[in-house]
């Protein structure tokens, strides 16, 4: 059976989403399927079942498929850092801090890791659905394109193009992407999916005719724009979240500092009909928020400095209403933060924190990566840790008066904790089952896509020939 590559004709075309959709449809047809992305660039990551670290997109895709997670799904992960540097995570572990030029110069040394992971999965599953990255036809970078060209050429994958019609220029992007692909890859293209169409789908009937007859590319389906508030991969995805504009019981503000990470911690709050969630990226008053949350951060001291320069730091110190903090945000609550090993900074650095917790944070060289059930806030909460910062007095969580915080991600996924926390702020809060919501949303979304896709053509194309 042939493997599949999902190529976007632009960034944010819907590759991550269509990867889990196609994979789940194949799985339901009795095929053993795994998602894969050779290289991802994201500050949003999760700890796998094997204790390694991969991008949130591949973790979420695996969750949809109900398969175990491991670094094999995403062998190379880049996390942006200070001054153009990035953390290079290979096979689940941080190996270096590099600038972009160094990374591309050393790219050939990373190809064996990509091959090892892909081939390990290929022994375990019938079909790998490999998500591409950005555009597959950046001509100046094609020899360095691990996620698109390298995988498609090396494993002769069948290719599905995904085009975002919402951006405009869909015909140029489809024709240009297809015709700029190397000839041997063009012959592997199954067809194109037109994504994010707004309005009556029949209005694109003529567009289908043009693509199929003039471009000679089969159209596998036209998908309407459908809000899907799960699996946020990056800042672009975050900006697209949709909440129903009905009357809310609670208004929660999340401080969206420049290096904010792990947006997915707030998916349960976005999904909650009783909560209005707002991301704060400017120095506005925090008084009208019932609760304020400090999220994770890739560069904690940098983001702490950002708080200090725009007046939010003083507002948080003086606030008497609830403050909740997660991971990097939790570290900001302490009195002092020390980075002697230059984990996040170019020089050994000490910074003054908010002083709301009576201890200090020291950044250790070895990152803590752990996935478990944690005894925090009077409950056993499933989640994961991913941090360098260490607190001797409060190694997992802190709770006193209006201040609560934890190193543990996914705490708001826990129905009992979320209900307990929000009901303490608003007695009228009822709560809901996020896991049930999530399952229903995923199934409904996949079914809506399946009805509009030429699944038969995809299944025929991946059979061994």
UniProtKB/Swiss-Prot annotation:
Keywords (alphabetical) are:
Cobalamin biosynthesis, Glutamine amidotransferase
Biological process (GO) annotations held by this record are: cobalamin biosynthetic process
The UniProt record lists the GATase cobBQ-type domain at 249-417
Per its UniProt record, what SUPFAM superfamilies does this chain match?
Class I glutamine amidotransferase-like, P-loop containing nucleoside triphosphate hydrolases
Asked whether the keyword Cell membrane is assigned, the reply is: no
Spell out the catalytic residues: 327 (nucleophile), 409
For this protein, what is any one GO molecular function term? catalytic activity
Q: What does this protein do?
A: Catalyzes amidations at positions B, D, E, and G on adenosylcobyrinic A,C-diamide. NH(2) groups are provided by glutamine, and one molecule of ATP is hydrogenolyzed for each amidation.
Check the record and name the HAMAP family matching this protein: CobQ (MF_00028)
Q: Which family does it belong to?
A: Belongs to the CobB/CobQ family. CobQ subfamily.
Q: What is this protein called?
A: Cobyric acid synthase
Identify the species of origin.
Acinetobacter baylyi (strain ATCC 33305 / BD413 / ADP1)
Top-down, what is the taxonomic lineage of the species of origin? Bacteria, Pseudomonadati, Pseudomonadota, Gammaproteobacteria, Moraxellales
Q: Which gene encodes it?
A: cobQ
